[in-house]
Amino acid sequence: MNVILLDKIANLGNLGDQVAVKAGYARNFLLPQGKAVVANAANTEVFEARRAELEAKLAADLAVATERADKINALESVVIASKAGDEGKLFGSIGNRDIADAVTAAGVELAKSEVRLPLGALRTTGEFEVEVQVHTEVKAIVKLSVVAED
């Protein structure tokens, strides 16, 4: 099924690209989310008329994401206290939700889906740098300090 993308989508294309995708992906994800329209003559004309508006919306989203990334990078070390053993091994782990909640408590709104932990949850005390993907093109680094709870 051919669709016209209304947004930048990772591993697929940018705004205005006409791409071929599987019918289920288009019907179940792209079309309901408003990220694409079926590529036909009528939709192509409508898209060309709205192209400037959509590009302005993407630029505004990017500007907001860049501003949020600057706020996240400006944060001092975010401290998370958790119960730990004598050698600094945590009883449990610190995951995406815990990090997102701590950053939100520090004053910058952050969703758990934006936190990237490629090596999995944190299981020891110490200093960590956690990557946060605020937008498809914008990333930030959170300085995280995991300390043992009294």
UniProtKB/Swiss-Prot annotation:
InterPro entries (UniProt xref): Ribosomal_bL9, Ribosomal_bL9/RNase_H1_N, Ribosomal_bL9_bac/chp, Ribosomal_bL9_C, Ribosomal_bL9_C_sf, Ribosomal_bL9_N, Ribosomal_bL9_N_sf
GO BP: translation
GO cellular component: ribonucleoprotein complex; ribosome
Pfam families, A to Z: Ribosomal_L9_C, Ribosomal_L9_N
Keyword RNA-binding: yes
Protein's job: Binds to the 23S rRNA.
GO terms of molecular function: rRNA binding; structural constituent of ribosome
Alphabetic keyword roster: Ribonucleoprotein, Ribosomal protein, RNA-binding, rRNA-binding
Protein name according to UniProt: Large ribosomal subunit protein bL9
The keyword NAD is assigned to this record: no
Signal peptide: none
Species this chain originates from: Shewanella woodyi (strain ATCC 51908 / MS32)
Family indicated by similarity: Belongs to the bacterial ribosomal protein bL9 family.
